[in-house]
Design a protein with these regions (language model features):
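Hydrophobic pocket-lining residues within nucleotide cofactor-binding pockets
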Residues: 1, 52, 73, 91
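Cytosolic catalytic cores of cyclic-nucleotide second-messenger enzymes
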Residues: 3-51, 55, 59, 63, ...
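Residues at secondary-structure transition points
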Residues: 10, 14-18, 55, 74-77, ...
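Catalytic core regions of nucleotide second-messenger enzymes
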Residues: 39, 68-84
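A structural signal for short, well-ordered beta-strand segments
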Residues: 45, 84-88
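Catalytic-core segments of nucleotide cyclases and related cyclic-nucleotide turnover enzymes
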Residues: 54, 58, 62, 90-121
């Protein structure tokens, strides 16, 4: 989630929790039954899109971004706008999963540096 630390610092951890819930609700409505999502740490998640080409995966995550940023959630009578950045990669047969996660993580940080609320391929 973009600017998650600032959200927590300025509005409190309950606002951060609500942002995570808003993201989870959006994910559950958008992803396919075969897709999986897991919290990776803090405000970072891993989304597994089995049998999905990387360009199609990028389109799926872009749809997720539009769905999340298309709606606001309320926290203590304030409307909160939430976005997220994502890095995407394809798992290469025989590689360590950590290597794929590292590529996705690098792409994530490139997306954040490039202005946030975007998905880049790593």
């Amino acid at each position: 989630i973009d600017n998650f630390k600032r959200l927590n610092d300025e509005l409190g951890h309950s606002a951060g929790d609500e942002a995570l819930k808003a993201l989870a609700a959006t994910v559950s409505k958008t992803l396919r039954p075969t897709d999986m999502v897991a919290r990776y740490g803090g405000e970072e998640f891993v989304v597994l899109l089995p049998e999905t080409p990387v360009d199609e995966g990028q389109q799926i995550l872009t749809r997720l971004q539009r769905s999340l940023s298309g709606g606001l959630f309320m926290h203590e009578q304030k409307q909160i706008f939430v976005t997220f950045s994502a890095g995407i990669t394809a798992y290469r047969t025989g590689e360590r999963i950590e290597d794929a996660l590292e590529r996705a993580d690098l792409a994530l940080y490139q997306a954040k540096r490039a202005g946030k609320n975007r998905t880049l391929i790593g």
